[in-house]
């Protein structure tokens, strides 16, 4: 266990801490079914501490208004994550059974590299713009300004599939927008989150409370507390549709903004004039991490007249899919536990329709999910020295 160098503590109010009651739980390696280590089991009391820190940081520090500070902090964070990538890679494979090959792509390295997109967006984004004064039957001429402001305290609840990717897709845009964040990690893959806390603790430009990490067992009490608490402004949740409904119901009591990425897989549709030998090669992606991914096609629709031909091609494809030890870089299938992810880009909005979700991650649209839009009307004769007359 010691060779993994995994972080077992929570990250609350700028410090790595044990759970308040000292409780821990085992992290089980799905490949060997042996205990790989332990991690802190956060309670409702720990959730309260994290929310108090996040609320205090948002209201009392300059995090939400100091763009330069956020850029420095996120640059430090990105560089710190790159520096620990080799340790983190071993931890991810041990806790999730994710084939190590995928950690050199979307399940680790490229997700960290995608922080650059948020940094570039933060550097160039117009948080304030003037709009034309079209006049009004009430009052005199005014300077009208549309301002984007950080939405507040964000609770991010992430799944065990592609944990590093989903963690970063939620927390980085939220932090870049000026929100403070409490990340509740999936109980099966806690080290994908605790490493974030360890690295954040070493970033001098993160004020205490800007980012917090909680790991817990699967009882549901901590999640229920976080989604219902009035100190929370935004909930970003990825998981099942059934749990998403409960999150939405809980959040509605205090009218929280709710972003839901829920269950749902689309079929691969093959038309009757397709070259099946080429078209069906893509069906092999369902084997990545045994199909445990929301973007992996688990259904295939082919013309009835070409059914037998399709089955023969698929049989040949699947016989050649490499599987086994996830530490072997040649394998794309490990044990049943965690997800592979494909077709993502940092600048491409991703999300569900209908019952598969609300809101978007990635791209400008994902960034703006964590901003509030306000319009200010400042009379033309308003004193220029007033704070209201100054740009954001």
Predicted feature locations:
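Gly/Ser/Thr-rich beta-alpha loop segments that engage phosphate groups in nucleotides
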Residues: 16, 99, 154, 230, ...
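Structural signal for hydrophobic packing residues in well-ordered secondary-structure cores
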Residues: 58, 62, 78-85, 89-92, ...
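N-terminal Rossmann-like NAD(P)+-binding subdomain of aldehyde/semialdehyde dehydrogenases
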Residues: 1-142
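Short amphipathic alpha-helical segments
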Residues: 63, 74, 168-169, 194-195, ...
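Residue-level signal for inorganic ion chemistry
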Residues: 33, 70, 92, 178, ...
